[in-house]
Amino acid sequence: MTRAAPDTISFATRRSILLLSLGTFASMAAQRICDAMLPELSRVFDVGLAQAAQVVSLFAITYGIAQLFYGPLGDRMGQFRVITCAALFCCVGSLVAVFSRSLDMLLFARVLMALGAAALIPLAMAWVGDAVPANQLQEMLTRTGLGSTMGIVGGQLAGGLLTDLLGWRWAFAFMT
């Protein structure tokens, strides 16, 4: 009795999975980048800590709502295309944050970032599910998801270190 050769994953698919993992990293890093900088934002914009924390809350709310729309959009326009556009949108939001002169402008930038970041994880997982053979799906989903786990830690670490060493704007420049 002969065994069927296992389905293999092409180099192009593996490269795409690596890029998607970087995208999921960016999504979670964008979400957590402000955690450690809240006291500095409170000081710079001369507002209370609760008001400065809106940069985290507004991002999370926008992120959660926006995710609902990306599945159908990815099905209609193509997952990778939507991921690419969303990543660029997140970068634009980060760039707006770098040049924010008021808390309101920073809040607007965080909404832009969230609108982009919200697409990255669900569409990356969907793309992997469509592109990878069933017998290797769990491993590839884990590799893709590893990016988001690392992004949680990386975002908090980068936000704190860059804010302390260079200033809060550099944390957003890092996300660009």
PLM region spans:
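Cytosolic juxtamembrane N-terminal segment immediately preceding the first transmembrane helix
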Residues: 1-23
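Extracytoplasmic
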Residues: 15-49, 67-70
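Small-residue-rich transmembrane alpha-helices and their cytosolic helix-loop interfaces
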Residues: 24, 56, 60, 87, ...
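Residue-level signature of mid-helix packing/kink "hotspots" within the transmembrane helices
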Residues: 32, 60-68, 152-153
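Conserved MFS/SLC helix-loop-helix module at the cytosolic interface between two early adjacent transmembrane helices
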Residues: 65-101
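Paired small-residue
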Residues: 93, 104-112
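Helix-loop-helix hairpin linking two adjacent transmembrane segments in secondary transporters
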Residues: 105, 143-176
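Cytoplasmic helix-loop-helix junction between adjacent transmembrane helices
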Residues: 109-148
